[in-house]
């Protein structure tokens, strides 16, 4: 028999197998730590009370379940209590094995374990518990979900919706050992997508946001409005906030003539392209920060659910596994997700029956999108932020899209939108309470990327979409657009789901490869979407469409792709006589911005012209109703890469401050008018604000100064050259 080398495990042993499989050693260590973790957690009165309460609630739910599920029976209530205790012990002991099994198969494994692990553990508990009879696995599967529904309902009634217990249980499942204490403060930046400063001020005064209201009333934090320049959209604002540069983002979607492609920032490849142009390696999160659920990474070394990062290669789903295998994670969120979809159907019908105007049709597809993004992904985001707080991450930036998502479809000040805002406030309160037990002190900064404006859509008001109006006027000018692209969809509503699907595509292994091919069409492909291989440069190709109308809220960029470069007003008038005057006089259009060969950028209204370069106004100023920053915003926007041949902004209703979106959204942002440019920043009161905050790039510089104030960013490398983009 051969002698094994000293200290080398025998070939036939489990340790020997682990030695030959590097990834397995961690799994074996996890298996050994499972029971140790369960017994090592310190016990105190609060934990004892919480544990006893959890056992009683789960036992009550299971007693009810056994009485309604065929194939299940128990002789006495104490047998059920014993089964609950056994299930808890099995869950704690098998956690590392379940996590390893899930990770071996990537996201599919995680989801399968999330769906079936609770049922399998409950089935084992039934089998080994005396005097409980179960007719196979499927009665146990049904019982696991019915009991979960009852448990969630009871827990919600007992806790009044507080999420602290949910988060603490998940963190116990994702325990990462003791982290040394650090004195240097960390910073958690929470973006509440689409929240306007006036709305937050009202919500604080009303007390409907207890956490933020308490901070501001107590004087620990200060509310500072900031101006989101045109275009007030998430990609432009996040490029500015996270990378300090948004000059290459003229809208949510735009056309690049030199490459013959439509860029849509909610597409992962396009988001990656945008970040490559914006990043210099010194983004907001470059100093060991974490990006969670954003469009761009901010140069963070670690990012999750970040749309631009999908092309960086696969990452293991270990950070997600605790959420999906915990009975307090995926099971709870899945049930609440279904409830959210039902709530959306009810609220949409109620809005319709009450005759609330303006409103849009809220489809079943949106109900599913809302349910996934506002429950499942919000819970997942919260767990990820909490995990990195407990690991002592230096800085964390997370975007919560709950409010923005609902406000687009219901209206920014409608009841269901405000309820979503209250939910985000609860999350902030939970994270702040958790941070008190973190290995370093944390400061919280809350901000928005833009606001929202309300109004009936352009199509609702005038019976036809903007692209049809432009096409009709071109035909009247003797040059009908026989081939055109109308980019006026609602891809922004799918952005949170796109982030999740992009994360799925990142996973290693067989399942990751399969999912990458199957999900490509879902998260990427659409007519005219960005394709790097299409970039040719030079003159536009003959087969290019005659017209492209790319809408972002109540702002539209109009391109004539068969004419290379950006057309001047004189060239447009030559090619399409009368088009500019007809557009400027349309009742649904507030103004048209174009560039002249003599005066540079000008704004045309139905009764006047505003020359942006000189400030000279002829007739009635078309920007008079749009606020004091309008001219400066448009002058800056005119210098953006790939801005349209024409920039069209909708009308603004003087009595209500409502706009007319060129997309089918009742709440919108992207142009001028209403609250869409009035973003907000809530920060520690002791942190000074160095002047008026105009634009996301300015806010980025302020955030960087604050990070430097607490000791961050001292060791960052010099900036790298940005990727240039032709105009």
PLM-predicted stretches and their roles:
Residues 167-220, 461:
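Active-site-proximal N-terminal segment of extracellular/periplasmic enzymes that hydrolyze or transfer
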Residues 197-329, 333, 478-515, 519-525, ...:
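Active-site nucleophile/metal-coordination loop of metallo-enzymes that catalyze phosphate/sulfate
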Residues 375-376, 380, 388, 396, ...:
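A long, amphipathic alpha-helix that forms part
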Residues 425-463, 601-604, 609:
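Metal-dependent active-site segment of extracytoplasmic phospho-/sulfohydrolases and closely related
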Residues 161, 165, 244-411, 553-560, ...:
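His/Asp/Glu-rich, glycine-adjacent segments
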Residues 243-256, 317-320, 385, 418-426, ...:
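Acidic, His- and aromatic-enriched active-site or binding-groove loops in soluble protein domains
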Residues 266, 270-279, 285-288, 292-299, ...:
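Active-site neighborhoods of enzymes that stabilize oxyanions during catalysis
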Residues 2-138, 153-162:
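Juxtamembrane/disordered regions of integral membrane proteins
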């Amino acid at each position: 028999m051969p002698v094994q080398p000293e200290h080398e495990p025998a070939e036939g042993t489990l340790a020997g197998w682990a030695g030959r499989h590097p990834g397995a050693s961690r799994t074996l260590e996890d298996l050994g730590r499972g029971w140790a973790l369960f017994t090592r957690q310190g016990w105190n009165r609060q934990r004892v009370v919480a544990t006893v309460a959890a056992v009683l609630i789960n036992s009550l739910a299971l007693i009810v379940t056994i009485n309604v599920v065929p194939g299940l029976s128990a002789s006495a209530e104490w047998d059920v209590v014993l089964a609950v205790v056994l299930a808890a012990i099995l869950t704690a002991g098998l956690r590392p094995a379940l996590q390893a099994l899930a990770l071996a198969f990537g996201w599919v494994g995680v989801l399968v374990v999330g769906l079936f692990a609770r049922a399998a553990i409950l089935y084992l508990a039934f089998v080994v518990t005396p005097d409980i009879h179960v007719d196979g696995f499927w009665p146990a599967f049904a019982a696991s979900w019915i009991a979960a529904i009852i448990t969630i309902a009871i827990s919600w009634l007992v806790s009044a919706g507080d999420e602290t217990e949910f988060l603490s249980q998940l963190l116990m499942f994702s325990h990462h050992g003791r982290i040394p204490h650090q004195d240097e403060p960390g910073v958690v930046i929470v973006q509440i997508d689409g929240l306007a400063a006036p709305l937050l001020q009202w919500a604080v005064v009303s007390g409907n946001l207890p956490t933020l209201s308490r901070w501001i009333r107590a004087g620990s934090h200060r509310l500072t409005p900031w101006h989101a320049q045109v275009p007030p959209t998430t990609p432009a604002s996040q490029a500015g906030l996270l990378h300090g540069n948004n000059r290459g983002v003229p809208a949510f979607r735009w056309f690049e003539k030199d490459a013959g492609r439509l860029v849509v920032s909610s597409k992962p490849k396009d988001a990656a392209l945008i970040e490559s142009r914006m990043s210099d390696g010194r983004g907001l999160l470059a100093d060991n920060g974490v990006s969670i659920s954003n469009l761009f990474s901010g140069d963070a070394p670690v990012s999750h659910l970040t749309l631009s990062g999908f092309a960086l290669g696969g990452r293991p789903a270990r950070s997600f596994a605790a959420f999906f295998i915990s009975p307090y994670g995926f099971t709870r969120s899945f049930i609440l997700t279904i409830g959210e979809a039902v709530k959306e159907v009810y609220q949409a019908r109620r809005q319709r029956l009450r005759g609330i105007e303006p409103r849009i049709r809220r489809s079943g597809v949106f109900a599913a999108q809302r349910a996934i993004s506002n429950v499942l992904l919000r819970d997942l985001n919260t767990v990820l932020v909490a995990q990195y707080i407990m690991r002592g991450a230096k800085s964390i930036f997370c975007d919560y899209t709950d409010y923005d998502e609902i406000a687009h479809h219901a209206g920014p000040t409608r009841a269901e939108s405000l309820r979503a805002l209250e939910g985000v406030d609860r999350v902030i309160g939970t994270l702040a309470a958790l941070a008190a037990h973190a290995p370093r002190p944390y400061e919280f900064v809350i901000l928005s990327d833009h606001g929202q404006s309300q109004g009936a859509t352009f199509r609702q008001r005038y019976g036809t979409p903007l692209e049809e109006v432009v096409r009709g006027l071109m035909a009247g000018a003797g040059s009908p657009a026989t081939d055109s692209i109308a980019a006026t969809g609602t891809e922004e509503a799918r952005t949170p789901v796109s982030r999740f699907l992009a994360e799925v595509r990142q996973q290693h292994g067989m399942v990751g490869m399969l999912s990458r091919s199957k999900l490509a069409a879902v998260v990427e492909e659409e007519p005219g979407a960005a394709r790097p291989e299409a970039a040719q440069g030079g003159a536009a190709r003959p087969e290019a469409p005659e017209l492209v109308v790319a809408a972002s809220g109540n702002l539209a960029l109009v391109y004539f792709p068969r004419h290379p470069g950006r057309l001047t007003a004189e060239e447009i008038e030559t090619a399409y006589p009368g088009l500019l005057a007809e557009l400027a006089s349309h009742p649904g259009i507030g103004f048209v911005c174009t560039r002249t060969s003599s005066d540079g950028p000008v704004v045309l209204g139905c009764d006047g012209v505003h020359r942006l370069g000189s400030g000279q106004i002829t007739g009635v100023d078309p920007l008079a109703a749009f606020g004091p920053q309008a001219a400066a915003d448009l002058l800056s926007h005119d210098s953006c890469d790939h801005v349209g041949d024409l920039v069209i902004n909708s009308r603004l209703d003087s009595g209500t401050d409502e706009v007319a979106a060129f997309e089918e959204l009742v709440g919108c942002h992207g142009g001028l008018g209403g609250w869409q440019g009035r973003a907000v920043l809530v920060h520690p009161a002791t942190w000074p604000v160095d002047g008026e905050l105009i634009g996301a790039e300015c806010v980025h510089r302020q955030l960087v100064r604050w990070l430097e104030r607490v000791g961050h960013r001292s060791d960052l490398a010099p900036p790298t050259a940005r990727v240039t983009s032709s105009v």
